[in-house]
Amino acid sequence: MLDSFKEDPNLRKLLFSGHFGLEKENIRVTSDGKLALTPHPAIFGPKEDNPYIKTDFSESQIEMITPVTDSIDSVYEWLENLHNIVSLRSENELLWPSSNPPILPAEEDIPIAEYKTPDSPDRKYREHLAKGYGKKIQLLSGIHYNFSFPEALIDGLYANISLPEESKQDFKNRLYLKVAKYFMKNRWLLIYLTGASPVYLADFSKTKHEESLPDGSSALRDGISLRNSNAGYKNKEALFVDYNSFDAYISSISNYIEAGKIESMREFYNPIRLKNAHTDQTVESLAEHGVEYLEIRSIDLNPLEPNGISKDELDFIHLFLIKGLLSEDRELCANNQQLADENENNIALNGLAQPSIKNCDNEDIPLADAGLLELDKMSDFIKSLRPEDTKLRAIIEKQKERLLHPEKTIAAQVKQQVTKEGYVDFHLNQAKTYMEETEALAYKLIGAEDMELSTQIIWKDAIARGIKVDVLDRAENFLRFQKGDHIEYVKQASKTSKDNYVSVLMMENKVVTKLVLAEHDIRVPFGDSFSDQALALEAFSLFEDKQIVVKPKSTNYGWGISIFKNKFTLEDYQEALNIAFSYDSSVIIEEFIPGDEFRFLVINDKVEAVLKRVPANVTGDGIHTVRELVEEKNTDPLRGTDHLKPLEKIRTGPEETLMLSMQNLSWDSIPKAEEIIYLRENSNVSTGGDSIDYTEEMDDYFKEIAIRATQVLDAKICGVDIIVPRETIDRDKHAIIELNFNPAMHMHCFPYQGEQKKIGDKILDFLFD
């Protein structure tokens, strides 16, 4: 088979690609390391309906399922995002990072996963498992690695090496069966290199291979993986299926089911399973539709990795499967399967002691020799078929280091840390560290960092609910959401099918907005609009003794706005006009309304959030210049540009320079200690301002005004900017200065100060409920 790839560059490229999917289980725990007895978080919806976030055996055992992707990078991004979403939505709980369980309650108190109805097949199956195996053993968690070769690769091989009169599906079945045989024979190597469950609580399991650790927990003396040993998650007795042909494979599993050894194919706990994408996952379905992918089930959670597995591990498993494809197709009889099982158990229990491996002739081979033989073969086909790939070569070298130096294995490192810190403390410390890392980047959707932050937020919230998301236009932040037959198109997170087109046009035009609101007795600032800059300049005398705002007619985000609260010169006025006309062909000059500016976010006639916006500012220290203080404040990791982070960096443009000049300051001025210097008059977060949540504190009087304004313009998702007087007695002196048809949600979700609001959830509720 190797010759087929050497001769065909297209096949060579396809060989190192594939389709990848991951399933990861984690137990939810309390802050002191006990099994969380709370229900599955309601935000994820019914387990039957969410394709991404379900439960495994227990209500406390969450399962994350990525969609099928075309690369390891993309499937890892999905896993990372799902892990982050679940972590952030599991309130006051942590995700236990080990395959072996945390502190467990009594057997009868371990909750089995709940479903829509008590007689759900999923519930009944779990009750069967609890009765047959016990509940505690079901809490062993891990990662399932789903893989299929590209269809074009199978087509190419079928054309070159299929048997006479062999159908493509029969060829495909034979191909995957061959890889499965290689995996079954050599899985001991994968367990040695990826095993990560050598430590456990003393009351969870007992084996003659264990020793006690200082904290009273237990560890396999020289072991790698309790989960993959005979003390782990196995069928009650060894089930040897016939790998000589696909039909024989199907028949042997069917015979075990008929004999009552297992209830269904779901209970066939083989380290690798042949599967197809049909949802019933019965042996009859597999027989009818044939093999579509492989499911590797023996991967432990790696507590040293935030997401339970590294990309290097994923790449190595891929290479392992490629090796299976390129290897000779050898018989895997019951005797050989028994030897393979013994090798697996021996490595799982004694791998760090480097025991010998039994070959098919029952001969002892030193572990390092046997492992290096397989790794060298992988190196050879990488050199032959992908010589330029230094990353894959480095991955193989890393595995060789682990073979030659057992202390470098994942299992040895985990055992060392648990011995030092204690079983519960080590895993809790890891879980807390990973949670802190997740919280620090809670606003981010991995792989979508180039998109607007509000888009990332609503996308994450859609994933949490199991809503399918398609990117229609990345540059335009245009998404399609689908839940069942219900489809919604959303642009920039808040432009939806609920929008009224004329309402958007009215809000886009600030002159029209003010006219319509004023006609409905809603207070707005008085002013004039100008389309000719020369005429606007000539009107200087009308405004020179007033407090005014100069702003573009139709822009958003506070761009191009200048505010004069104190006396200003003709030159200042002209510069403000230059700035405003640079953003639009028309400008508005209106009265300045004293007070504090608040953003009211109204969704479907309800105020969901209120934000006080403080203009861009720095606080002096008596040492640094204004420019240096801005540079320092902009180092905050939550500040970015183009709405990709919760806060915007403070700019040093003409608007800010003008503002400084109005205070008789420059960029080189050194403010006194604790002196606050404002760089903008307008308080938009989009121009570097600070956001403070005021939802609970805001008077209902102003909330009702915000709602009434959106109703006048028939706006369903709207940002209402209101100047609120500081004194209650003056509240009738408020004014609405703007309505926004595309309000940013991120500043409510991640304010500079105050409670974070789940605005993505509110919009999705509006769209789908």
Curated annotation (Swiss-Prot):
EC id: 6.3.2.2, 6.3.2.3
Ligand binding (Mg(2+) 2): 738, 740
UniProt: Mn(2+) 2 binding residues: 738, 740
Cofactors: Mg(2+); Mn(2+)
Record-level GO cellular component terms: cytosol
Annotated Mn(2+) 1 binding sites: 721, 738
Membership in a protein family: In the N-terminal section; belongs to the glutamate--cysteine ligase type 1 family. Type 2 subfamily.
Quaternary context: Monomer.
The protein, known as: Glutathione biosynthesis bifunctional protein GshAB
